[in-house]
Curated annotation (Swiss-Prot):
Organism in which the protein naturally occurs: Xenopus laevis
Lineage per the UniProt record: Eukaryota, Metazoa, Chordata, Craniata, Vertebrata
Positions of region (Disordered): 1-21, 333-367
Membrane-crossing residue ranges in chain numbering: none
Protein name (record): Protein NDRG4-B
Highest taxon above the source species: Eukaryota
């Protein structure tokens, strides 16, 4: 098991005395370079925002948010983080909003059938075709991570890599369904969604972060549309994946994957289980210390460093600075696979960078 440690040399968030930027700030962060599009797909319209233009054969970075959020609530803090600009200048970035979840979305008419999770995944090729993307690197959180995993299983040739945060590969059984229904009867929809996004400790402490998201989920996401998305996510099926060699004709994600979860996140056990279903030769497991349910919001600096390292492992950005990444050589390798295992792209990180070369084995990362 390889371990990476990330010492902080500057605050993760601009306001050192707050857990997150004010609600007004993170909802109205500079969006002048972003262009909005409504794209027709086989299962309805998708609202997306895009910055940059496709750069040759380089993949686009495509994001998909969690249930209860939209691209702004989920990703603004991460993509506005200072060090993230070094990455985004090399890629076109496209944020996808699940149907009806964007700010100002019209309410769906009564009787509207919300797309299934499989159909949400099947809408993404229309986005790629619209912009001329040849391939993508996906960043998904929660429900968005599930959508990207399903997309990669259906269209593996379109995916070069994925960062899956808080993914739950399991469907909901009837007991889970009943518990969800009971929760809906005793709690408001925003409170039910908050229990999905945050740990019980975070909710009990009623942190400023939780308070901000409670307000934004209630005011910035159409509640009727959110209920439809929430119901569909809780009707999802198992992602039919198995680690190669464990069952005959095992099917799993072929592209490099970085799994991310906070060590105090409600999705921790689910992400650990997902890791057991993936190919150890191209999977990195990042468990973020002192982080709850939204590591991309509370720990954007650490996640940016890990993402930069992940991209370098795919052969991109070989000269990108890694000034805040300290690598520990004291941890042991746990994967049975050789470090000479193949990746779709050669890793360009050299031994001179503190001695870590190719990352061709499963790593568990603590930071």
């Amino acid at each position: 098991m390889s371990e990476l440690r990330f010492p902080e040399e500057k605050p993760l968030l601009r306001g050192q005395d707050t857990e997150m930027e004010s609600a007004d700030t993170f909802m109205s962060a500079a969006d002048t370079d972003w262009k909005e599009h409504d794209i027709e797909t086989p299962y309805g319209m998708l609202h997306v925002v895009i910055r940059g233009t496709p750069k040759g054969n380089r993949p686009a970075i495509l994001t998909y948010h969690d249930v209860g959020l939209n691209h702004k609530l989920c990703f603004n803090t991460f993509f506005n983080y200072e060090d993230m600009q070094e990455i985004t200048k090399h890629f076109v970035v496209c944020h996808v909003d699940a149907p009806g979840q964007q700010v100002g979305a019209s309410q769906f008419p009564q009787g509207y059938q919300y797309p299934t999770m499989e159909q949400l995944a099947a809408m993404l090729p229309s986005v790629m075709q619209h912009f001329g993307f040849q391939s993508i690197i996906g960043i998904g959180v929660g429900a968005g991570a599930y959508v990207f995993a399903k997309f990669a299983l259906i269209f593996p040739e379109l995916v070069e890599g994925m960062v899956l945060i808080n993914i739950d590969p399991n469907g909901k059984g009837w007991i889970d369904w009943a518990a969800s229904k009971l929760s809906g009867l005793t709690s408001s929809l925003p409170e039910t969604v908050l229990s999905h996004l945050f740990s019980q400790e975070e909710l009990m402490n009623n942190t400023e972060l939780v308070q901000n998201y409670r307000q934004q989920i209630s005011s910035c996401v159409n509640q009727s549309n959110l209920q439809l998305f929430w119901n569909m996510y809780n009707s999802r099926r198992d992602l039919e994946m198995s680690r190669p060699g464990t069952v005959p004709n095992a099917k799993t994600l072929r592209a490099p994957v970085m799994l991310v979860v906070g060590d105090n996140a409600p999705a921790e056990d689910s992400v650990v289980e997902c890791n057991s279903k993936l190919d150890p030769t191209n999977t990195t497991f990042l468990k973020m210390a002192d982080s709850g349910g939204l590591p991309q919001v509370t720990q954007p600096g650490k996640l940016t460093e890990a993402f930069k390292y992940f991209l370098q492992g795919m052969g991109y950005m070989p000269s990108a600075s890694m000034t805040r990444l300290a690598r520990s050589r004291t941890a042991s390798l746990t994967s049975a696979s050789s470090v000479d295992g193949a990746r779709p792209r050669p890793c360009t990180q050299s031994e001179s960078s503190d001695g870590i070369g190719q990352i061709n084995h499963t790593m568990e990362v603590s930071c």
